[in-house]
Amino acid sequence: MEAAGARNRDARSRAEKSPPESRKVYMDYNATTPLEPEVIEAMTEAMREAWGNPSSSYPAGRKAKEIINTARENLAKMIGGQPQDVIFTSGGTESNNLVIQSVVKHFHKVHAANGDTGGHPNPVDGALPHIITCTVEHDSIRLPLEHLREERVAEVTFVPVSKVNGQVEAEDILAAVRPATCLVTIMLANNETGVIMPVPEISRRVRALNQQRVAGGLPGVLVHTDAAQALGKQRVDVRDLGVDFLTIVGHKFYGPRIGALYVRGLGEHTPLYPMLFGGGQERNFRPGTENTPMIAGLGKAAELVAENGEAYEAHMRGVRDYLEERLAAEFGERIHLNSQFPGAERLPNTCNFSIRGPQLQGRAVLAQCRTLLASVGAACHSDLGDRPSPVLLSCGVPVDVARNAIRLSVGRSSTRAEVDLVVQDLKQAVARLEGQA
């Protein structure tokens, strides 16, 4: 963490020395993160020294293959899995789509193979594969599922989250299971509220249910979690989570914009089918010549998380908590913390809040800010205009409060000095807006 400490000091020094009109403070780390210097170095070295095709036997190719293998090992270590269960993808969207498409294809394949039941009724005969998710998922889960439903390729149940704690309840997931259910996909942590979902409990309940289903001739239910927002901010271990699939997104933990997918017992215990066809790379599950420099960067980012994760988490939690203290001190009862729910844990870096007032819509406040760089919510929902976030509404946040929402997410180099600048910037932005009324 010495390098991180140096970066913190550098950031603090910049914040203190820069003239007020030129100071910019980035607090949108849930949207994306900058590359760590070590990541840039790993990528640059790969471009310079490992330019060969990883499938080739000459030195530059062997070097590329070695880098890819090391990166796979680092990713596995970060999540407590096995290297052979990790494949590289272009990013979280591809990983999520790959899971969904694979499970649907597997359902049809197994159902066709088991079509002849010797005159006995097949409990899923004629049924479409059924997938369960929740109402606050990322678009890379929600939209593929809506598309499958519109095309009548699958049936989908969107389970609402609790308006008390912002979580999806395991009991509600189990209640939605049907004979043709083949997948439950629930994000590990929400990108807008930071609320951590009870994925371990859901996995445990589904495993117990699967024992009964198999005995009754029903297909087993697989469990997937999109861990994009959790990785690099809290401990993530697939053994504790008990999932069959886990999505990894590099640019959320200071890595490059590629991703990976963990598949428990890839190809043996858990099915996976390629969406692309070509060469034999990634054991035919994801063909195409590997992007060695990006993979090198992803592996280095994972290595840093495995080595420094606890320190990263503690630092971000301290800065985030200080941010919420300062907001409360400055705005008093006008502040509504949209990401604090009783009985629910949340990411250590995320603060979603609203400043009450008829002129203080989140976008309007941010537009008046001269220092703060942030967003009102998920980057993929940037086209909502002044409409309140569907995620916050699903969590029970009132419409007038949700419309004023701002999401601040701190990072590894965020400082208390930057928090002070941001709160002062928000105070001045609010004063300007209310002065215009």
Curated annotation (Swiss-Prot):
Q: Which gene underlies this protein? A: SCLY
Per its record, what are the GO molecular function terms? Answer: selenocysteine lyase activity; transferase activity
Q: Give the family from UniProt.
A: Belongs to the class-V pyridoxal-phosphate-dependent aminotransferase family.
Q: What does this protein do?
A: Catalyzes the decomposition of L-selenocysteine to L-alanine and elemental selenium.
Give the sites modified to N6-(pyridoxal phosphate)lysine: K252
Assembly mode: Homodimer.
What SUPFAM superfamilies does this protein's entry cite? PLP-dependent transferases
| Domain of life assignment | Eukaryota
Q: Does the keyword Nucleus apply?
A: no
What is one GO cellular-component annotation here?
A: cytosol
**Keyword Lyase annotated:** yes
Annotated active site residues, numbered on this chain, are C380 (s-selanylcysteine intermediate)
> Could you tell me the keywords of this UniProt record?
Acetylation, Cytoplasm, Lyase, Pyridoxal phosphate, Transferase
**Region: Disordered, residue numbers:** 1-30
- Compositional bias (Basic and acidic residues): 7-26
Q: What is the name of this protein?
A: Selenocysteine lyase
**According to its UniProt record, which reaction does this protein catalyse?**
L-selenocysteine + AH2 = hydrogenselenide + L-alanine + A + H(+)
Where are the N-acetylmethionine residues found in this chain? M1
Name its cellular compartments. Cytoplasm, Cytosol
